[in-house]
């Protein structure tokens, strides 16, 4: 949690925890070591965090591109992702090797990614 709060402080973002028992949407290609890793957060609903994470430049509109994953298992996929999961809805990140970009995208607050 401290690393997540530090990212939020660095970018002046609100913090919203992604509890370990909640789910995020993640693309299977994240496990393949493809870069960059992209993440975006929409408003959470039900038992989800609102996070969608994928590797590569673009994500697919295919209905099975994102699979559900409990937050507690994210380290098994890519441990670098966890530090960004405290960013509030409307925030995005892109990481690749030693590169990091984090920004606010107000369009995400009206979005229905992965639906």
Segments (PLM) and residue ranges:
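Extended, charge-biased low-complexity segments
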Residues: 1-9
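Short, compact, well-ordered microdomains
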Residues: 70-112
